[in-house]
Design a protein with these regions (language model features):
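Acidic/negatively charged segments and metal-coordination signatures
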Residues: 1-41, 45-46, 54-383
Length: 383
């Protein structure tokens, strides 16, 4: 069984220094790797209260679930947009051999270290306001995608003005010490930026924005909206209190989604709608509906579900549009093909064209390769 020290020893020295900085370990940097492993491992083992206070809320709540399950007991979880820090540094175990889900567990030695302290760490995060500050920060990043450091600090000061749960000095320290600044900042053309952890190539957002000259400013959102958008990491959702959002929740619930599965599908629609010009992303926006197509009785009901998803997606803030929605900017809209598309019209006029797609049982996948059942694809055209 690998110990904490064994795991740390697998990293390069430069990586260990990144871990040291993130965990806030006051250990010497300019030492041999062997000594750095010993000192960093000793810090993790002997000072859990100190380094737990440096963790993101998402990591602490995952740790709490793993502690509740017990040492070496795996939990089956979905794949989020980005891994937890503790998975990245391999302090908790994970098995990603199954493409549909991953198993995560806490090793016995880490369990012994954190179990007596994890509840207090979460309690402190809530009572100090640190979690809410983090949610506001994540919310602004989820809404805008990429911000200059100056824009980010200005927005966070808006949040502080609305809450004032800490002194300005304490609040400023919380921002400067934020794990997000350590994890999600980068330099580009002489400017310092911070980006959503859900984005893998933040530079592509900056370059993509140049294609939308009509968007000349950032849309403003209230601090409450930012906290809403940053709650529930890593599955962020937004706009569920709008008429389009309420329609979406009702429709997905009717299709059988509930609890974590419902939140995950709501989140996926927002994330995939960001890049709706990409064919793969456009299809993925509607995955929650197409996955349940066998439970939908008629094409009219199926089409209504798709319309609800598209209507909701077009109200959401987009990274490329600096927080504006597709409806507001009048671009990057999710648009469904009309029922009477060109191919359908041609087949209705000349049924022989339909022979190019062999008939299939109504609930079988359509032979055309669309991924839809035959009755919702070429079957509806031929009937």
């Amino acid at each position: 069984m690998n110990t904490i020290y064994d795991i740390l020893d697998t990293f390069l020295k430069a990586e260990l220094e990144d871990i040291r900085r993130y965990f806030g370990a006051d250990v010497p940097m300019h030492v041999r790797k062997k000594d750095l492993v010993e000192k960093l491992g000793g810090y993790i083992v002997t000072k859990p209260s100190q380094w737990l206070s440096k963790m993101l809320e998402r990591d602490l709540r995952l740790l709490s679930r793993l502690v509740d399950a017990g040492p070496e007991v795996p939990l089956t979880l979905g794949y989020p947009d980005y891994p937890s820090v503790l998975e990245t540094v391999r302090l908790i175990g994970s098995d990603t051999s199954d493409p549909s889900c991953r198993s995560v567990w806490i090793p016995k030695d880490l369990y012994d270290v954190v179990a007596p302290h994890i509840d207090e760490a979460i309690k402190e995060g809530e009572s100090s306001g640190a979690f809410e500050v983090e949610r506001a920060a994540l919310g602004y990043l989820s809404i805008y995608g990429v911000l200059t450091i100056e824009e980010f600090f200005d927005l966070m000061l808006d949040y502080w003005e609305s809450s004032k749960k800490q002194s300005l000095d304490r609040f400023t320290d919380m921002i400067y010490e934020s794990p997000l600044l350590k994890l999600c900042s980068f330099d580009h053309e002489g400017m310092r930026y911070i980006f959503s952890p859900a984005i893998y190539e933040p530079e592509s957002i900056l370059s993509g924005r140049t294609e939308f000259d009509s968007v000349r400013d950032m849309k403003r959102f209230s601090p409450c909206q930012a906290v809403e958008a940053g709650t529930g990491a890593p599955y962020f959702v937004f706009g569920l209190d709008t008429s389009e959002g309420k329609d979406l929740v009702r429709m997905l619930s009717d299709l059988g989604y509930s609890g974590d599965d419902l939140v995950r599908e709501e989140h996926e629609i927002w994330m995939h709608s960001q890049m709706c010009g990409d064919n793969d992303a456009a299809e993925a926006i509607f995955a929650a509906v197409t996955a349940k197509q066998d439970d939908i009785l008629t094409f009219e009901q199926y089409n209504a579900c798709m319309d609800i998803v598209a209507a909701y997606a077009n109200t959401l803030p987009k990274w490329l549009l600096s927080g504006y929605s597709a409806n507001e900017a009048k671009c990057l809209k999710v648009i469904l093909q009309p029922d009477e598309d060109q191919l359908g019209a041609m087949i209705r006029k000349n049924p022989l064209l339909g022979l190019f797609v062999p008939p299939a049982a109504p609930d079988d996948l359509c032979p055309c390769g669309s991924g839809l059942s035959y009755r919702f694809c070429h079957g509806r055209i031929m009937n």
